[in-house]
Amino acid sequence: SEMCIRDSFLAKQLDNFLHRNPATADALKKRIEQNERERKELAGIKKLANERAKKANLHNKKLRDCRVHLNDELPAKNKEAFIATQKDTTIFITEGDSASGSITKSRNVDTQAVFSLRGKPLNSFGETKKVVYQNEEFNLLQHALNIEDGLEGLRYNNIVIATDADVDGMHIRLLLMTFFLQFFPDLVKKGHVYILETPLFRVRNKQETIYCYDETEKQAATKKLGNKPEITRFKGLGEISPEEFGRFIGRDIRLQPVILEQGDHIQEFLGYYMGKNTMERQDFIINNLRVELDLID
C-alpha cells in the first residue's frame, strides 16, 4: 500500500542518515535507552504515588475546592452561561496558612479554589518526571489540577500563583514556574498560568482609601489625598484582611500572565536562573543589583 511504501522509504532514508552521522545515531540511541529506563522507573513510582494521592484527595487539607470545574459536563440547559462560569474557574496556589486563610475566606466558592503550599517547594530543575510523584506536594498539586495524563481533564481555567511580593515570595514564584515549565509547559503555552498582583501599599484618610501596587501609585495617592494620609505597607498576603482581599480577587483582579515565547529555549532559560550558581549568574546579579528606596519620607 501507499503507506507501506512511504514508511519503507522513510526508514531507508533514516537508516542512511544515521550511518552517515554516527555521533547523532549514538546520541539518539542513548536518549532512547534513557527514556526506556525512566519509563520503567516511573511506572512503579506512579502506581504507589497515585494510590497515596487518591487517599489524600479524599481529605486533601491543602485544597479548598470550588463547586464548578473546567472539566465538568455541560448541563442540559443554560449551556452558554455555564461555559462562561467555567472560564472563570481559578485555583490560587499560595504559601502558608495566613495567606491561604485570607483567600479562602474571601473567595468566590463557586469558581475559586485554594491550594496551600507548606514552605518553599522543591527546585525541580534538572529533575526527571519521577519527582512529580515522589514529592508529596507536587503530586497532590498535579492531582488537584488533574493534568497527569494531559490537559484534557484540567479542572481550572486559571492557575494563579499567589505569593508575597518580597524576596521569598518571588523565589516561590520562580520555583512554581520552574515546575510548570519543566513538566507541564503546555499549561503556560496555552495561557493558563498567571501571577496574582496584590497591592504593596494602602494610602487612606478619613474619606478615601487607595490601594497602590507600586511606588509610583503610592506617590500619586499620597499627593491626591494630601495632608499626611496614613500609609500602610503590606509585607505579606497574610497581613491583608479577608474583607480587603475580596477586592483584589474579585472583578478588579490584576493578573500577570506567564508568557512563553516561541522557540526551544526552556531548558537554557531555566538552567541560567534555576541551575547551578555559575560565575556568569553571579556577575549578572552584581551588575544588576537594585536597592529599593522609599521615595517618600
Identify the meaning behind each predicted range.
Residues I83-A84, S98-S100, K105-R204, E208-I210:
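Conserved structured catalytic cores and adjacent interaction surfaces
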Residues S1-E2, R6-K120, L151, N158, ...:
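GHKL-family ATPase ATP-binding module
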Residues E215-G271, D283:
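C-terminal or mid-to-C-terminal helical accessory/interaction module adjacent to the motor/catalytic core
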